[in-house]
């Protein structure tokens, strides 16, 4: 395979970095009136302004060269054609098939997967219609008012993020709840708000053996039966998203209410599949299909557009520029919309679980940085929390500022204030404030020269801080589908360039294996096992505390 450090463009970019690292965006804008127009893209309802980055035409040309040398176009083709690019698990990677609205065949192991995809989608729609219309009744013949999704990781973060983001499109009768943490308090809090007669539980676990999910599911089942008293009532209040029909049936769920997905759907890419059942229940089939349409639009742009005008590719390459050349170890997601407050955590899992890898596809140490730490918060809150570090800290931290052009509320003046802050932050990160500008400002306030010189270093902003401004014309299912697909493809492209597998997650396994051993010790089912002295001390502390 091709190793990044052996690619000619990798070395060319280092030479270019040495020549260009002192360039300031402020001067680049002053010298180039067409800069914003040139570094500007629109795809469907999304607009990307990437002009406020430490790039010029040579930077982008070399990055596109790097992408081609790394085999990005070929790898993209392989994914869309169902080839098994997840090599460590010998699986295809076909979340794009879940939103393939053309229904053109996508073949895996000689079988077109589209009939299966459409069959499950149709069953989801029928089920959602019954619940939303009120024809699905609980064991006391009451309509469903609350839906509790029990899952973890991709079975939780995607549906939770999308239901929260699109709350204005949700069914007014349905209250959505999500349980992922096995600590007990999250489930207890949810159960205290719902009534067994009107609650539908969705258990989302591919194998139906995930410890955290099954623990919560069994507790919810026990709570339900304590009220209902009849095991046959379980079938009216529990549905499953799984492939383990036997375990689902043993739980008491009618397998007619089990919705399957496939091993070529990774958890963090699964909200488009049956894992998205809570989304369809809340938003309805039509809006769910619109979400798929938006994702498909981005898929078609991604696979059919030259790299030079390809939105996910450009975002990926700019990220490579900062991570691997500037040493930018983190990336901020800052949505300026309260309903998008779950988006940073979703992107965090998507990016860090996909690309937090230390070896290449052929098992060699990568020898360079891979996934940055992804973090963030709604933009306005971030301005009064961590933006200080972004403006005047010592880190190079690229920021995605995400906003909607259309108002989401009828409250006068709010949206204009919001967008003024978005645009102002992007300009401030780019321009900064020079010492002379600070002096002039303080002098105009009547401050004496000595005090001015004391304050100048503190009030100076270096600027040259990179941002991507991502605007939706409105927050709706279609644009949210496009936005998430954009980030999926960005993540994929970066993984290709780094030479890693973006679709496995072996890093989650070791802790789970060790937890099984320790659990036996904590419950008394096994005697003491061999651990390091710290772990043994922690186990003993727990046992001593709970003997009291």
Swiss-Prot record:
- EC number(s) of the enzyme? 5.3.1.9
Q: Name one GO molecular function term.
A: carbohydrate derivative binding
Q: What is this protein called?
A: Glucose-6-phosphate isomerase 1
Which Pfam family, any one of them, does this sequence belong to?
PGI
Lineage, uppermost ranks = Bacteria, Pseudomonadati, Pseudomonadota, Betaproteobacteria, Neisseriales
Q: Give the source species.
A: Neisseria meningitidis serogroup B (strain ATCC BAA-335 / MC58)
Please list the reactions this protein catalyses.
Answer: alpha-D-glucose 6-phosphate = beta-D-fructose 6-phosphate
Annotated keywords: Cytoplasm, Gluconeogenesis, Glycolysis, Isomerase
The cross-references to Gene3D superfamilies, in alphabetical order and at most eight, read:
1.10.1390.10, Glucose-6-phosphate isomerase like protein, domain 1 (3.40.50.10490)
Q: Which SUPFAM superfamilies match?
A: SIS domain
Q: Which family does it belong to?
A: Belongs to the GPI family.
Q: Is Isomerase given among the entry's keywords?
A: yes
Subcellular location(s) per record:
Cytoplasm
């Amino acid at each position: 395979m091709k190793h990044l450090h052996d690619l000619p463009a990798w070395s060319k970019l280092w030479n270019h970095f040495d020549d260009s690292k002192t360039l300031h965006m402020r001067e680049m804008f002053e010298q180039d009136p067409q800069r914003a127009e040139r570094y500007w893209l629109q795809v469907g309802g999304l607009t990307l302004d990437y002009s406020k980055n430490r790039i010029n035409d040579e930077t982008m040309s070399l990055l596109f060269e790097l992408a081609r040398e790394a085999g990005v176009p070929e790898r993209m083709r392989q994914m869309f054609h169902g080839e098994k690019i997840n090599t460590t698990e010998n699986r295809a990677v076909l979340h794009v098939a879940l939103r393939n609205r053309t229904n053109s065949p996508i073949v895996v192991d000689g079988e077109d997967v589209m009939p299966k995809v459409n069959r499950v989608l149709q069953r989801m729609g029928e089920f959602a219609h019954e619940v939303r219309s009120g024809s699905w009744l609980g064991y006391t013949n009451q309509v469903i008012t609350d839906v509790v999704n029990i899952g973890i990781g991709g079975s939780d973060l995607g549906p939770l993020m999308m239901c929260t983001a699109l709350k204005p499109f949700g069914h007014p009768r349905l209250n959505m709840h999500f349980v992922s943490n096995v600590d007990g308090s999250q489930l207890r809090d949810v159960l205290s708000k719902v009534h067994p007669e009107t609650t539908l539980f969705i258990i989302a676990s591919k194998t139906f053996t995930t410890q955290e999910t099954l623990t919560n599911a069994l507790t919810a089942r026990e709570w339900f039966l304590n009220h209902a008293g009849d095991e046959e009532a379980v079938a009216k209040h529990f549905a499953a998203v799984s492939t383990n029909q036997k375990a689902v049936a043993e739980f008491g769920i009618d397998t007619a209410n089990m919705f399957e997905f496939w091993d070529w759907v990774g958890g963090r890419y699964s909200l488009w599949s049956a894992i998205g059942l809570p989304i369809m229940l809340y938003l309805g089939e039509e809006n769910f299909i619109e979400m798929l349409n938006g994702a498909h639009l981005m898929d078609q742009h991604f696979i059919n557009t030259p790299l030079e005008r390809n939105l996910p590719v450009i975002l990926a390459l700019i990220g490579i520029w900062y991570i691997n050349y500037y040493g930018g170890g983190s990336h901020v997601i800052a949505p300026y919309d309260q309903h998008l407050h779950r988006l940073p955590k979703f992107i965090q899992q998507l990016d860090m679980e996909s690309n937090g890898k230390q070896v290449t596809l052929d098992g060699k140490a990568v020898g360079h940085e891979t996934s940055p730490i992804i973090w963030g918060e709604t933009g306005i809150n971030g301005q009064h929390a961590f933006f200080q570090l972004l403006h005047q800290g010592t880190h190079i931290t690229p920021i995605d500022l995400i906003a909607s052009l259309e108002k989401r509320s009828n409250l006068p003046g709010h949206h204009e204030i919001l967008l003024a802050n978005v645009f102002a932050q992007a300009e401030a990160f780019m321009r900064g404030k020079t010492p002379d500008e600070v002096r002039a400002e303080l002098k105009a306030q009547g401050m004496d020269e000595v005090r001015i010189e004391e304050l100048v270093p503190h009030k100076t902003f270096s600027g040259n801080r990179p941002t991507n401004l991502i605007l939706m014309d409105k927050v709706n299912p279609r644009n949210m589908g496009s936005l998430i697909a954009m980030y999926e493809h960005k993540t994929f492209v970066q993984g290709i360039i780094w030479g890693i597998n973006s679709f496995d997650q072996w890093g989650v396994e070791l802790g789970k294996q060790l937890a099984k051993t320790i659990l036996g010790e904590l419950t008394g089912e096994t005697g003491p096992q061999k651990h390091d002295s710290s772990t043994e001390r922690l186990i003993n502390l727990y046992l001593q505390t709970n003997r009291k």
